Structures are given as structure tokens and as C-alpha cells.
Amino acid sequence: MKKLIILGCTGFIGKNVAEFFAREKKYKVYGTYFKSKPFKNNSITFLKADLTDKAQVNKVLQGKDILIQAAATTTGSKDIVSKPYIHVTDNAVINSYVMRSAFENKLKRVIFFSCSIMYKPSNKPQKEVDLNLNLDPFKSYFGAAWMKIFIEKTCEFFSRFK
């Protein structure tokens, strides 16, 4: 049975994804938590990990086949504007360690959730082809948007190694 790990398993997205795969019974499901206590689900093996610590990232990814990266430092849109460094620094560190460790541990699949923070405000739905990296993102989201783009490019970088 393939081993699937969901980082950020106690967050909104991570919990829903973990519960879905736990019901499927096709995978041995692992989930990380840090500040939020794990919820009750006997089909998920919970692992406490500080994902800003490289050694702990390596430990939870060892021996896994599939990674779903749903972990992040999040505090809300107010902090994105008033204290943007919180999201930029922690999430850049977390995702850099996660992507490197996934590569070094030879995980077969990595799923990384992105968002639309890097797009300019618009009255029409945006597509990936609408992103112009020559233009700065919306002023209030400058740091978080460029961090997200950096991590997307980090995923692409590691995907190029065979």
C-alpha cells in the first residue's frame, strides 16, 4: 500500500484532504500537525513536526510515496498587509525544505497548492497565462505573492531532475 503524507493535516484544506483519502482506504495516510492538535481519525497516523526544521521535515517524508503539501504559516489577510514578513519568511523556509526533502527522499508524487495572490485585481476570471511576471503583484500582497511564485518555480526546478 502506498504511503501518502499530508503536511498541514489539521488545517482546513489538509483536514478535508486527509479525511477524503482516509475514507478511500487505498493509501496508508499520514498527516502532520504542529500547533493545532490532531483530530480523531483512526485511519490517519499523525506526526508532530515543526516544518521550519530541516531534520523534522526529512523525518516525516522518509519512506513516503506521495506528498500533499497543505502546510503553511497563515494568520489572515490583515497580517498579509500589516506584517507580510510572517508569511514570506516562514513559508519560504517550510516549502524550500519540503521540496528539497521530497526530492532527496525520491517521493514519486508531490502536490503543491498555490493560490491567486500573485494576480492583479480583475473583474474577469484569471488563468495561468494571464500572469505577467514582469509586473509586480498587487501592492499589499507583494511579499506573499513573490514567495508563492518562488515556491512554484522551486517545484518546477526539482521536477526537471530525473
Give each language-model segment a name.
Residues 69, 96-141:
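Conserved Rossmann-fold NAD(P)-dependent oxidoreductase catalytic core, especially the SDR/UDP-sugar
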Residues 139-162:
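Active-site Tyr-X1-5-Lys
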